């Protein structure tokens, strides 16, 4: 979590500040002295107003209108999150829902999608999962003729994923060479990553060239080469629940539109979430603390999940307005990350 300047608060100011933040996060409305008095603050309204003014001077609160109450600034939210937030673990029902939906997936990607969708629904935020894409391990590869000059290379990965690429064929390319090439690849390279397969390919194919049709030999080389290094290592970002960001749009339509635009910049989001990989616990980015979401004034709560060997595999996160129930959502994101670590690993 981000560090903040040392801010000295009296016990009275600390109590009032915490009440203001908790009330604001619950209602989304500025908090005034009368509201605080009703919550049991044992001070006169005038004394409460004095403390509120003091907190505003320190940059922890602001007043959106002259006659309105106070609401926390980003600095105030950071102070609250770092030292005053009361964490509330997910309920048994919430934990069961997350675990059941992750287990229900038939492939790693489907499990990640399910986790993202469930987390989004429970938090009423947009849910994200970042997967630094691992090099694909070949299970099976086949070719399908599209027309006289093109074939579709279809690869099935060991994780159940399926990818397609179009390969150009020379005029009169024999259909038998497609079958011969796919049979050779599946017999010799199943269970290998593409970089490993390429190394084996050039050491083996010369020895066995006499047993292979020249067209099949050429197709084998291109069939393995078509999956480029860049495409294999491009991170995958799954986003679900964008509709939750529009629920309060009637109050702040411009902010919601801005956030939806920011969510389209998947490369920048991936860069932000990759920073989380250096930590074992949930990280919180509030408003302008991250450049990407500074215009919309949004918060990101993200936590890494790990593989069997303990290395970071990906990051799960939620994005929403800065007025989030941090105490509830932070443990929920952490639990989802731990569930993914346990089940997917």
Curated annotation (Swiss-Prot):
InterPro entries recorded: GAF-like_dom_sf, HrcA, HrcA_C, WH-like_DNA-bd_sf, WH_DNA-bd_sf
Protein keywords: Repressor, Stress response, Transcription, Transcription regulation
Alphabetical list of Pfam families matching this protein: HrcA
Chain coiled-coil ranges: none
Record bears the keyword Methyltransferase: no
Single GO MF annotation: DNA binding
A single BP term in Gene Ontology: negative regulation of DNA-templated transcription
Family to which the UniProt record says this protein belongs: Belongs to the HrcA family.
Protein purpose: Negative regulator of class I heat shock genes (grpE-dnaK-dnaJ and groELS operons). Prevents heat-shock induction of these operons.
NCBIfam families: hrcA (TIGR00331)
Full protein name: Heat-inducible transcription repressor HrcA
Organism of derivation: Zymomonas mobilis subsp. mobilis (strain ATCC 31821 / ZM4 / CP4)
Highest classification ranks of the organism: Bacteria, Pseudomonadati, Pseudomonadota, Alphaproteobacteria, Sphingomonadales
This protein's encoding gene: hrcA
